[in-house]
Amino acid sequence: MSLSNNLSKILIIDFGSQFTQLIARRVRELGVFSEIVSHKKIKIAQITKDNIAGIILSGGPLNVYENDKFKFDKKILKLGIPILGICFGHQILSKLLGGKVKKSKHREFGLATINKVSNSTLTKNFFNKNNRSDVWMSHADQVSKMPKNFKIIASTKNSKLTIIENIKENFYGVQFHPEVTHTNKGKILLRNFVFLICKIKKNWSSKDQKLKLINEIKDQVGDNKVICGLSGGVDSSVVAQLLSKAIGKNLTCIFVNNGLLRKNEEIQVVNTFKKKLKINLIYVNAEKEFIRKLTNVSDPEKKRKIIGNLFIKIFERYANRIKNVKFLAQGTLYPDLIESKSVTGSQTSKIKSHHNVGGLPKRMKLKLVEPLKFLFKDEVRKLGLELNLSNDIISRHPFPGPGLAIRMPGIITNEKIKILKEADFYFIKALREHGLYDKIWQAYAALLPVKTVGVMGDNRTYEHICLLRAITSEDGMTADFFDFPKGFMQSISNQIINNIRGINRVVYDVTSKPPSTIELE
């Protein structure tokens, strides 16, 4: 595997962490180019001080005792390049340099407070006035003995060697995840590593990102025709605009109404893209086809794979009609990939199949074009601004490709779809009316697979439970529930129950991610 260009960069060696791309994204936010490569594929000949300013070793699901499952050339440690190990990266760096790692007596998952022990360039402005900082932990092993010439920078109650460093060799290890937003000043720590320790200068911007993606599309596609699966959301809209700039008239967008869209969504999408943006768009009404295939299916993985397969069949059907179409473009994002599979070939744990990743058929006639697959939602929104997309497209809440199918656990019926469309409509409408929509990362209504007893007008009811979910997030990797102002939940609960037949109870989901995912299925 060759590194992509001659820009001085931060190299991230991936050991399978769910957060690896988040590290790269944090470095890009600093205005510095970064690149990820699997620990299985990196070769020492590719790394020189001329093209690599610093190396970050990611976390991962392995442990350092599984020597047969990870590869790392120890010669990399002798190149004189600054190295930062994060979580598993911290442990493997310590072990390779002669330290010891063992299972923790007390595992640490979630928020933890670390205490400053010594000063360090790495932790400049990282601790508060009480010499503490809140960080996000996710580990069952810990470094129990430091390598020679290392010193302790910070500790927790359960982990003495939480931050360690060898300033002479420029080796640094942190047991927590500075890349996630829950680590209070994680961005400061990464900034210190990039600029104060690696001494690299800014060399990257969103404009560079746009031009890079357009050129990559041209290189991949050439003069061939491409169809783009358009949903009307920000992801597929940005992909469509990138393709339009890269290949012009060789692009045809296809919008499939799978019967699982939000209320009036198909009308809004067609009006926006066909009439306003003048994009070559084909509208396909496949409601009956999707609902028939999903009849009596309750398993969420099967739902996603049925939907993914059917989307591809429809795209291939229309590709044959257009003729000479070789590629299918879609708005896959990095969080989709890391919940479905490993991107770099490292041992990432699968969370669930996304319809456009793990849900795709193994034998596809069309080749995939996924220009956004290494980006996060907010990065895509910035890219949308660079592409001059309107704010109503850029600010839309995420909506999953399988649509309402994964917002009604259990068997899908036309009656449930109708009820859920109305509940979601009232919820989103209320958010807009109260000026809350743009303060929330994603909000939706779901229908739970149980009914409960209620009383309406002195009569007994036995109807569905509507679950409302609204979360705040920066990138979709971690999320917290939105704390609504007093009175809002009571108001929307009354609206839903009074206006929609079939619901007699409304609940609000206050679970964060992790442990939950944003969608129910």
Curated annotation (Swiss-Prot):
The record places domain GMPS ATP-PPase at 204-396
Provide the reaction this enzyme catalyses.
XMP + L-glutamine + ATP + H2O = GMP + L-glutamate + AMP + diphosphate + 2 H(+)
Pfam families, alphabetically? Answer: GATase, GMP_synt_C, NAD_synthase
InterPro entries per the record?
Class_I_gatase-like (IPR029062), GATASE (IPR017926), GMP_synth_C (IPR001674), GMP_synth_GATase (IPR004739), GMP_synthase (IPR022955), GMPS_ATP_PPase_dom (IPR025777), NAD/GMP_synthase (IPR022310), Rossmann-like_a/b/a_fold (IPR014729)
Q: Which UniProt keywords apply?
A: ATP-binding, Glutamine amidotransferase, GMP biosynthesis, Ligase, Nucleotide-binding, Purine biosynthesis
Q: What is an example of a GO molecular function annotated in this UniProt entry? A: ATP binding
Which sites bind ATP? S231, G232, G233, V234, D235, S236, S237
- Under which EC number(s) is this enzyme classified? 6.3.5.2
Catalytic-site annotation from UniProt: C87 (nucleophile), H177, E179
Name its pathway: Purine metabolism; GMP biosynthesis; GMP from XMP (L-Gln route): step 1/1
CC annotations in GO: cytosol
User: Per the database record, which ranges form the Glutamine amidotransferase type-1 domain?
Assistant: 9-203
Its quaternary organisation is: Homodimer.
| Protein's job | Catalyzes the synthesis of GMP from XMP.
Query: What HAMAP family does the record tag this protein with?
Result: GMP_synthase
Return the protein name. Answer: GMP synthase [glutamine-hydrolyzing]
Taxonomic placement: Bacteria, Pseudomonadati, Pseudomonadota, Alphaproteobacteria, Candidatus Pelagibacterales
